[in-house]
Amino acid sequence: MKCSKYLIALGLAVSACSSSGSSAPTSLTLVTYDSFPTKDSGVNTALAEFTASTGITVRIVTAGDAGTMVSKATLTTGTPEGDVMWGVDNTLLSAATEGRVFDGSPTEVDHGDVCVNYDIAWFAKHGVTPPQSFDDLVKPEYKDLLVVEDASASSTGLAFLLGTIAHSGERWTDYWKALKSNGAEIADSWDTAYYQRFSGAGGSKGDKPLVVSYGTSPPAEVVFANPPRTDAPTGVAASTCFRQIEYAGVLRGTKHSKAAKRLVEFFRSDRFQRELPLSLFVNPVDPKTSLPDVFTKFGVVPADSLTIDPATIAAKRQGWQDQWHQIMVG
């Protein structure tokens, strides 16, 4: 999930003392999206413990939104800027595979849902019922209220596009034409949409009460609320949720393949997985991992999230994005 303003993201490295007896510890570079925390979070503490037990230091390099990150990685395939990549999702996995970004197959590390979020206070103030479905979003009462991310550049935007395709089928282009006519605004990234345009985000001065975000955005608003609060200021239109699965993998061309594989294996460990809910606001891939109360109380994990077969995404993603761009941008 994107949560860059929920987390302090200014540092560049996570390191600790190497284990005793290791004369030449390995340093790995982890390439990830901008919202991955670089210090002061549970995942950083877990990475420091990984370093202490293995002698392998981990330097974090952020590379933009997941879509931008994958695009950069395909341009440097074979001579990567790092050793391991975190955050390629199921909407972009085919692009990474076609670009031969990874050495072997990447590993599933977490999942979440891309959904429409709404500002509870705004709708209460205006006496309007929040939308609950894709069909609601094109109704007159929601005109000029929604901001969505660029589906040709943002992984969040692409996931929402795929959700509309799963919902509308072959008539998805008509749906987007209706969304455009109903005043849907396009933002270049999730950060811009959520923190600058959405009225429900903490500290935001935006005026859009509807935004494409995540089913786990409400608990993040509670955790990082200032002043503290015990209720979520935002809600989720659960019928609009599209399942997003994130992967991590060893980058093809790394000079530290064995150490890189150890790091990817560590990502699947309980020690790392249990830090994901309150560090990245995503669900651990291991269903046995315990979840914090605030995460389960305010987060939304639909039992029937929309999905599209990965092979279909691989075959049609670029064409869908091109059609979307023609409709929404021209």
Q: What do the PLM-derived regions correspond to, one by one?
A:
Residues 13-16:
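C-terminal motif of bacterial Sec signal peptides marking the signal peptidase cleavage site
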Residues 103-109, 135-138, 223-242, 251-253:
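Short beta-strand->loop
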Residues 163-240:
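Ligand-binding pocket segment of bilobal, Venus flytrap-like solute-binding proteins
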